[in-house]
Amino acid sequence: MIRLGIFIGLAVGLATVAHGEEVQVAVAANFVAPMQQISAGFKERSGHQISIISGATGKFYAQIKAGAPFEILLAADVATAAKLVAEGDAVANTSFTYAIGKLVLWSARENFVADGVDLLKRATFDHIAVANPKLAPYGAAAEQTLKTLGDYEALAAKIVHGENIAQTYQFVATGNAELGLVALSQVIDENGKLKSGSMWIVPQKFYTPLRQNAVLLNKGAERAAAKAFMAYLQSEPARRIIERYGYGLPP
């Protein structure tokens, strides 16, 4: 009922917009594929254009503190949005969980990944790609997984760090690492099918839940288009897209 109210409010708000605007949205790298579809739907309904800037959540935090022109942040964690609100860089009471991410062990090679637990324990590979745990929440989740399942000291010498989850994926896709811990959304299509290679979905008991929060930043506080997108992100059309890419949804 709450989401229905949000969507009705959005429809009314869009009717009052005289012309389309462009909204600057900083998007955690794992969420780019669904975001492209969501922003297309939003443009069709509202006339507003979304400018997607993708990267690591930790890096976005630093850029926002330095005055970057982002109006909305779609983070890969909960803490960053909360911190920005507490520090006065984002609007209070606008943060919400838009997706719950899932981590996968993925290889571009078919049949390379079957039993992920056994593969990580044996560590018979040369390189494993992991996002920088200091900048990327998916990297922190990957590090937790490796420490839980494998001999981390032995694995550490094999780790290749990507600045964000997109670069981590590229290391594996190009063969610079035999496998990597990446986001499920990166390796499946919009119908939930594996696009290529082989994967093992990491059980969520091995890492802290990847709850991903959006927040309206100060630069978007007075922008009708930014507020409209925050509402649209919680609408049923957006939620259906998010779910198709393998994410969990908040109630």
What do these predicted regions represent?
Residues 3-15:
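Bacterial N-terminal signal peptides
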Residues 20-54, 58-68, 75-78, 82-251:
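Exported/periplasmic ABC-transporter solute-binding proteins
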Residues 16-17, 72:
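A subset of signal/propeptide-processing and intrinsically disordered low-complexity segments
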